[in-house]
């Protein structure tokens, strides 16, 4: 297995990203307990532009224990090419784990532009900057580098009452959000096939767990029940969805 030394986590102040950083440092985001599941001893650079869904308070314990030593935060938009290039060079990044994304379906319907900018152009900026930074003089890539792209199962469309998605399921995005993620997936795979960029990609289902923004379905349902408010019904209410606990998702990402 490659020895990971300097990991760039995009969107690390968001829900899944902040939980992943906790996981890397052996801190359970649920109860603060220590565990050493990841067995990671390197450095983490968290790049996040702190939109409404980003919250550095989620990483207060990480900052207190590792800030300035093994954990570093950079408030940077992933579309900012010069800043991304600076970070790659300054921290000698060998691994990028790309969580950063606009991810709320309803918001994508009301304002799709931000989703195209972040999810498509931001991913392109990261891929191209990494390609240039990791490329050796002979055109091949360093053998210690990897770009992992986090995607969603929504790129496959909607399931019926039976069946399941697989790696060979055709893409069938149905919203500006899922379309933007499908686009970023194709760009990522193009960099793998065209340039040979060391790359892995995962398409995960819905996550739930600590630090989740309250607009998401499970915390929204729970808060509405608590406050005696009506529960939202999407479409006819017959859509099938599943969820995975965020720490289980992050274990899978680390295994990949």
Where would I find each of the regions flagged by the language model?
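Short, hydrophobic secondary-structure boundary micro-motifs
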Residues: 139, 232-235
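A glycine/serine/threonine-rich, flexible loop-to-helix segment
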Residues: 163, 214-222
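Glycine-rich "substrate-gating" loop/helix at the edge of Rossmann-like oxidoreductase active sites
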Residues: 174, 205-215, 235-247
